[in-house]
Swiss-Prot record:
GO terms for cellular component: cytosol; endoplasmic reticulum; endoplasmic reticulum membrane; Golgi membrane; nucleoplasm; nucleus. Residues 400-521 are lumenal. Residues 1-378 are cytoplasmic. Belongs to the bZIP family. ATF subfamily. Glycans are attached at N481, N505, N518. The gene is Creb3l2. Changing L430V: Loss of S1P cleavage. The chain crosses the membrane at residues 379-399. GO terms for biological process: cartilage development; chondrocyte differentiation; endoplasmic reticulum to Golgi vesicle-mediated transport; positive regulation of DNA-templated transcription; positive regulation of transcription by RNA polymerase II; response to endoplasmic reticulum stress; response to unfolded protein. This is Cyclic AMP-responsive element-binding protein 3-like protein 2.
Length: 521
């Protein structure tokens, strides 16, 4: 954007929030309801592509470098190109792009004739979108309000106007323009045959602060326009349109109209921009070099405003999308956190239940092991007892102390004893001399001896304290060479010896005696 002119430099100050502060209803109350496409019927399809050959946008001829006439006043150029300041309520106006590569044709200049009117009535153009979607190649809706204001024209009149006998003062229009951003790419790479004129929608101009631009040329007390369309409502007002909207837009004059000779008809946007910048409005063709330069400059500024507003709109949309993503991510994060908390609580409860089950299982296993060990020990003890009983019955005939008994036998039963008496029912071996024959005639003595034996047996039982056992009839053998008295004494002594021995180990002696008897027979 060109911001320097006549050695003066200024700072661009864009009021980007004006379009977001106003209400759409207030602006619509000030506008007519004539559709924007109805004003474009005067353009034919052959004129749609003529904007690409505009010499005032791309051609840098040597004639442009010539200084303007000294008789013409110095243009009042401001740094800000926001042209929305006026004492009357302002609305949005449409505008468009023009191609940067144009060519100037002298034949078209001579063939075309155009008229110029010095007074322009107040007009308002309003376009409403039909759908909310904006496919690629679309531009936003625009509303244009043009207000006729009487301003002195003598200081801004060019030499061409003076030679043509223009009036000293006339009414000039100061249109106000408001934009809302839309895609810059929608204004480029288009074909006139791709869309019709009925689908035309123009983007609004960016928010502006006109005080910096027209501070020297307009009112000394500028005030901001209180009405502007909200940017939030712009996407809803978007309407599909063809790429031929730029070539048919009234914001820029068609290139073929700037050629030839005759009256010059400029668009309201161009006139408003020229007045806001302090340039005189050309009325006749051909244009002077200064007029061509000024017209080229204001057309370039219109393009720059479009690109700036589009960049802001894209940024706004991008930020809105990011905010929506952040909100969705935040809600999803909260939901996931809640789910994680629920899962953690469930995990804790499951762990507690698992620990309880483990303790129960370990207790049961330990009890089972203890019971199994106890049962095993009991079984082993029973088996050992069974073996002990079995082997005890098998070795009952040998006794627990066979060697000790055998060693004690010689002392218990000396060889000098003629015979041994037993207290149990058994057989006793009587020792006698074979060379002494037995006398069978001594039966009475035998009877007396048997009586003595019986008395000895009863005495033995009484002294030993044993249970009463049936008396055993022992045969008595009489040696022929001994007397009855000697026999009785021997029997008593033997009985006394046996009773004294049995007092120490009664059971052992009885078993031993029985064993000896059994072994003998």
């Amino acid at each position: 954007m060109e911001v320097l002119e006549s050695g003066e430099q200024s700072v661009l100050q864009w009021d980007r929030k004006l379009s977001e502060l106003s209400e759409p209803g207030e602006t619509e109350a000030l506008m007519y309801h004539t559709h924007f496409s109805e004003l474009l019927d005067e353009f034919s399809q052959n004129v749609l592509g003529q904007l690409l050959s505009d010499p005032f946008l791309s051609e840098k001829s040597e004639s442009m470098e010539v200084e303007p006439s000294p008789t013409s006043p110095a243009p009042l150029i401001q740094a800000e190109h926001s042209y929305s300041l006026s004492e009357e309520p302002r609305t949005q106006s449409p505008f468009t792009h023009a191609a940067t590569s144009d060519s100037f044709n002298d034949e078209e200049v001579e063939s075309e004739k155009w008229y110029l009117s010095t007074e322009f009535p107040s007009a308002t153009i309003k376009t409403e979108p039909i759908t909310e979607e904006q496919p690629p190649g679309l531009v936003p809706s625009v509303t244009l309000t043009i207000t006729a204001i009487s301003t002195p024209f003598e200081k801004e009149e060019s030499p061409l106007d003076m030679n043509a006998g223009g009036d000293s003062s006339c009414q000039t229009l100061i249109p106000k323009i408001k934009l809302e951003p839309h895609e810059v790419d929608q204004f480029l790479n288009f074909s006139p045959k791709e869309a019709s004129v009925d689908q035309l929608h123009l983007p609004p101009t960016p928010p502006s602060s006109h005080s910096s631009d027209s501070e020297g040329s307009l009112s000394p007390n500028p005030r901001l326009h209180p009405f502007s369309l909200s940017q939030a409502h712009s996407p809803a007002r978007a309407m599909p349109r063809g790429p031929s909207a730029l070539s048919t837009s009234p914001l820029l004059t068609a290139p073929h109209k700037l050629q030839g000779s005759g009256p010059l008809v400029l668009t309201e946007e161009e006139k408003r921009t020229l007045v806001a910048e302090g340039y005189p409005i050309p009325t006749k063709l051909p244009l002077t070099k200064s007029e061509e330069k000024a017209l080229k400059k204001i057309r370039r500024k219109i393009k720059n405003k479009i690109s700036a507003q589009e960049s802001r709109r894209k940024k706004k949309e991008y930020m809105d999308s990011l905010e929506k993503k952040v909100e969705s991510c935040s809600t999803e994060n909260l939901e996931l956190r809640k789910k994680v908390e629920v899962l953690e609580n469930t995990n804790r409860t499951l762990l507690q239940q698992l620990q309880k089950l483990q303790t129960l299982v370990m207790g049961k296993v330990s009890r089972t092991c203890k019971l199994a060990g106890t049962q095993t020990g009991t079984c082993l003890m029973v088996v050992v007892l069974c073996f002990a009983v079995a082997f005890g019955s098998f070795f009952q005939g040998y006794g627990p102390y066979p060697s000790a008994t055998k060693m004690a036998l010689p002392s218990q039963h000396p060889l000098s004893e003629p015979y041994t008496a037993s207290v149990v029912r058994s057989r006793n071996l009587l020792i006698y001399e074979e060379h002494a024959p037995l006398e069978e005639s001594s039966s009475p003595a035998s009877a007396g001896e048997l009586g003595g034996w019986d008395r000895g047996s009863s005495l033995l039982r009484a002294s030993s304290g044993l249970e009463a056992l049936p008396e055993v009839d022992l045969p008595h053998f009489l040696i022929s060479n001994e007397t009855s008295l000697e026999k009785s004494v021997l029997l008593e002594l033997q009985q006394h010896l046996v009773s004294s021995k049995l007092e120490g180990n009664e059971t052992l002696k009885v078993v031993e005696l029985e064993r000896r008897v059994n072994a003998t027979f």
